[in-house]
């Protein structure tokens, strides 16, 4: 049983995916609906939502100091040297290197990115998931 007083507990929050628009993600052919994301008043809230991949979309090798879990809902993805399909869950502990990803089929994934328990690194929302325009891939910061 928790020793936290009942009035200190936070209420459940629920968001339907249809309540959010698809937003421009930093990598070519990728779009996101982050249903939850860190905000000034809730800095430890995870990035959690959907990422849609167009056929042929990809991203390069890069690294993060936060942790994340992906669940493949649709499509096939080449991630590093392996191919994964629907029903596969992937876990990236913190810190981690994220290998190149590509998809010929396109697809859909559930993403949950959260503060790394080892590094304390927090997921980044602004300027990555809610972009008005993409930069060329070679101008993206692959160090975060």
Placement of each model-derived feature along the sequence:
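A short, N-terminal "cap"/entry segment at the start of jelly-roll beta-barrel domains
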Residues: 1-44, 126-144
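Residues that flank catalytic or metal-binding motifs in active/ligand-binding sites
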Residues: 31, 47, 68, 105
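Conserved metal-binding segment of the jelly-roll/cupin
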Residues: 54, 83-105, 112-115
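Double-stranded beta-helix
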Residues: 99, 103-144
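Short, well-ordered beta-strand segments in beta-rich or mixed alpha/beta enzyme
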Residues: 49-53, 73-75, 108-112
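Conserved short histidine dyad/triad with adjacent acidic residue
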Residues: 33-38, 45-63, 82, 93-97
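Glycine- and acidic-residue-biased ligand/ion/polar-headgroup-sensing regions
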Residues: 55, 64-79
């Amino acid at each position: 049983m928790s020793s936290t007083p009942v009035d200190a507990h936070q209420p459940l929050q629920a968001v339907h995916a249809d309540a959010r628009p698809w937003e421009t993600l930093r990598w070519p052919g990728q779009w996101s609906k982050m249903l939850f994301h860190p905000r000034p008043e809730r800095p430890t809230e995870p990035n959690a939502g959907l990422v849609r991949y167009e056929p042929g979309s990809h991203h390069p090798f890069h690294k993060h100091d936060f942790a994340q879990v992906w669940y493949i809902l649709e499509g096939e993805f080449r991630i590093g040297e392996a191919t994964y399909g629907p029903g596969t869950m992937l876990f990236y502990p913190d810190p981690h290197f994220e290998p190149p990803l590509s998809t010929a089929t396109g697809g859909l994934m559930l993403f949950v990115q959260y503060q790394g328990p080892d590094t304390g690194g927090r997921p980044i929302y602004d300027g990555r998931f809610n972009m008005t325009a993409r930069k060329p891939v070679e101008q993206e910061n692959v160090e975060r």
